[in-house]
């Protein structure tokens, strides 16, 4: 034996990979990952260290029996703390007073894996092969395609694959604050190498900060060139292990099954190093993978259990929606009564279809669920108001970070040709300075997509377009998510925009612009919102979150913000001249006869 892989040695010696890496660090042996090889001399040293470690344990085995007795006095403290925690419990199920277990006492959970890549590179074929060979016969009939995820059995344990196509679905989940996947598999065809969607998939995985494994598919084809793929990956600063980097690259064939066993092994090894754990006895939390309406059953939602255990009969809260679980189905299509961590289940019981990526929590009962939803609705309205205010007050420092620090400008680039993309990247590289870093999260050919908007919204990036324009749906989505899309057909104008972002030579200048005027004709007392000014708009228009000035006679008695507008019982954004409305100010001393003037801060276009 001249050389051996680290994970193979760990398996032979019955040692966890993490412990093996600790020993190698102590010996000063360099390695890239657990798939790196080590010399026979190093193997002998490791065996010697492990033998020495096991010897003292045998000698000291007698006094260990005292540990339980020593731990007993702590029990009354745990019991006494329980009532206090019960009183502090909120409507959504939260941790109870039992002492939190140490990290090493929390059991490991199965890794959750998503597979992404360019169309026709074999993502679906690879999933189908794994499903066919690693899932029980009763599960392999296509049922799992409706559940949105499936479980594969390996020698190392269970692996959960998310069966939701497309990296945009993956980013949709992350955009709502949930990281459902632990590992991302990037599938690249050996005869095609890197394609636009491949680069996008890699960018999305990097933005999510999840470990990546590259599966070079279709190696069975005569024209397959895996080495070209590895070389092309280095252009994205992704260096395969064979080239001295730390990127795991596995040649596979979804057609013949070649390399699939190795891929599953690497997934298990990566999961072990990530030390994935979840407490099945803790409070429940999960994520919506997908939701749909079934003609016969009604609303169905696929939930990935992340913490705790889900039971039939539990009340679940998702955003401003709730439901009681009437039935649960596992990835095999069988009815189950409970599901623990890293288990995908299809849930029947919601009245509305929940959105992908929404976080799920359990509630004690229906009343508690309704209370949570009401509170969340209030929070949402406050956030909408704050977001609208920020749109008129956003400064260069908000975009780039505090002055005096190294600031990062996140960008998504879109252009009409590859040559234009490369030219823009070259220009941006020369624009970086000591105090400013330019991070091009994604550069591609063609008009910006909804996936670009999702990526930009999660990373607070600006989308710059050269000679391409976004579609109406993409523009609307960007407006809703507060993402700036700027399109140019002259390269120098785009460069000027980059200069404004980087150097800050031109900071935004705002001026106050008159909107409208209203008379207060009655004051409406509201238990939650305080006093609302029942008013008639005599001139111009009123807009929610606009600035407000209240005058009484010749005296200005209030200056602030319009926090809400109502027409009858409906919340509205605008009210025009000649209409009555309720104006909610962050102020309760409004009186009948007062005059309210509305204005807004508008950015002045500069030469």
Swiss-Prot record:
Residues 163-166 are annotated as: G3. GO terms for cellular component: cytosol. It comes from the Bacteria. Residues 108-281 form the tr-type G domain. Residues 142-146 are annotated as: G2. Residues 54-93 are annotated as: Disordered. InterPro entries: EF-G-like_DII, IF2_II, IF2_N, P-loop_NTPase, Small_GTP-bd, T_Tr_GTP-bd_dom, TF_IF2_bacterial-like, TIF_IF2. Residues 217-220 are annotated as: G4. One of its GO terms (molecular function) is translation initiation factor activity. GTP binds at residues 117-124, 163-167, 217-220. Keywords: Cytoplasm, GTP-binding, Initiation factor, Nucleotide-binding, Protein biosynthesis. The keyword tRNA-binding does not apply. It is found in: Cytoplasm. It holds the Pfam family IF-2. Residues 117-124 are annotated as: G1. Residues 62-93 have a biased composition (Low complexity). Residues 253-255 are annotated as: G5. Belongs to the TRAFAC class translation factor GTPase superfamily. Classic translation factor GTPase family. IF-2 subfamily. One of the essential components for the initiation of protein synthesis. Protects formylmethionyl-tRNA from spontaneous hydrolysis and promotes its binding to the 30S ribosomal subunits. Also involved in the hydrolysis of GTP during the formation of the 70S ribosomal complex. This is Translation initiation factor IF-2. It comes from Deinococcus deserti (strain DSM 17065 / CIP 109153 / LMG 22923 / VCD115).
């Amino acid at each position: 034996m001249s050389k051996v892989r680290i994970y193979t040695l760990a398996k032979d010696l019955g040692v966890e990979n993490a412990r093996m890496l600790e020993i190698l660090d102590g010996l000063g042996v360099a390695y890239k990952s657990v798939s790196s090889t080590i010399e026979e001399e190093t193997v002998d040293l490791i065996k010697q260290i492990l033998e020495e470690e096991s010897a003292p344990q045998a000698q000291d085995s007698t006094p260990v029996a005292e540990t339980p007795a020593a731990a007993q006095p702590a029990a009354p403290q745990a019991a006494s703390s329980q009532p206090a925690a019960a009183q502090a419990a909120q409507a959504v199920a939260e941790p109870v007073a039992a002492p939190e277990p140490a990290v090493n006492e929390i059991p490991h959970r199965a890794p959750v894996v998503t597979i992404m890549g360019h169309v026709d590179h074999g993502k679906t074929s690879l999933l189908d092969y794994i499903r066919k060979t690693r899932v029980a016969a009763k599960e392999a009939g296509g049922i799992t395609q409706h559940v949105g995820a499936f479980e594969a059995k390996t020698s190392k344990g269970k692996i959960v694959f998310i069966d939701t196509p497309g990296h945009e679905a993956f980013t949709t989940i992350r955009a709502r604050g949930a990281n459902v996947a632990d590992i991302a598999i990037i599938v690249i065809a050996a005869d095609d190498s890197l394609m636009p969607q491949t680069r996008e998939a890699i960018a999305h995985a990097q933005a999510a900060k999840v470990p990546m494994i590259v599966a070079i598919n279709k190696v069975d084809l005569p024209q397959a060139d895996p080495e070209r793929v590895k070389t092309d990956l280095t252009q994205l600063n992704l260096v395969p292990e064979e080239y001295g980097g730390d990127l795991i690259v596995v040649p596979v064939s979804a057609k013949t099954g070649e390399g699939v066993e190795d891929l599953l092994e690497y997934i298990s090894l990566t999961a072990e190093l990530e030390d994935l754990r979840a407490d099945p006895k803790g409070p429940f939390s999960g994520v919506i993978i997908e939701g749909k309406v079934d003609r016969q059953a009604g609303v169905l939602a696929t939930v990935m259990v992340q913490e705790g255990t889900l039971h039939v009969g539990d009340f679940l809260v998702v955003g401003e929606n709730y439901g009681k679980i009437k039935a649960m189905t596992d990835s095999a299509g069988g009815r189950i009564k409970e599901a623990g961590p890293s288990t995908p289940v299809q849930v029947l019981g919601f009245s509305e279809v929940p959105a992908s990526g929404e976080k799920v929590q359990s509630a004690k009962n229906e009343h508690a669920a309704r209370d949570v939803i009401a509170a969340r609705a209030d929070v949402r309205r406050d956030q909408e108001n704050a977001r609208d205010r920020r749109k008129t007050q956003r400064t260069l420092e908000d975009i780039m970070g505090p002055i005096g620090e190294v600031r990062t400008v996140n960008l998504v680039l879109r252009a009409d040709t590859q040559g234009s993309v490369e030219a823009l990247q070259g220009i941006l590289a020369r624009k970086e300075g000591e105090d400013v870093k330019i991070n091009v999260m994604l550069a591609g050919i063609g008009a910006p997509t909804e996936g670009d908007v999702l990526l930009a919204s999660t990373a607070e990036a600006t989308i710059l377009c050269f000679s391409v324009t976004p579609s109406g749906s993409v523009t609307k989505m960007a407006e809703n998510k507060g993402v700036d899309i700027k399109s140019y057909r002259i390269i120098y104008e785009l460069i000027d925009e980059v200069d404004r972002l980087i150097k800050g030579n031109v900071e935004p200048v705002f001026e106050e612009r008159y909107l409208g005027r209203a008379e207060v004709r009655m004051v409406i007392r509201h238990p939650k919102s305080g006093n609302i000014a029942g008013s008639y708009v005599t001139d111009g228009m009123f807009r929610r979150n606009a600035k407000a000035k209240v005058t009484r006679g010749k005296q200005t008695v209030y200056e602030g913000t319009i926090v809400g507008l109502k027409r009858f019982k409906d919340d509205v954004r605008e009210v025009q001249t000649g209409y009555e409305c309720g104006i909610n100010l962050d102020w309760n001393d409004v009186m009948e006869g007062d005059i309210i003037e509305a204005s807004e801060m508008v950015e002045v276009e500069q030469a």
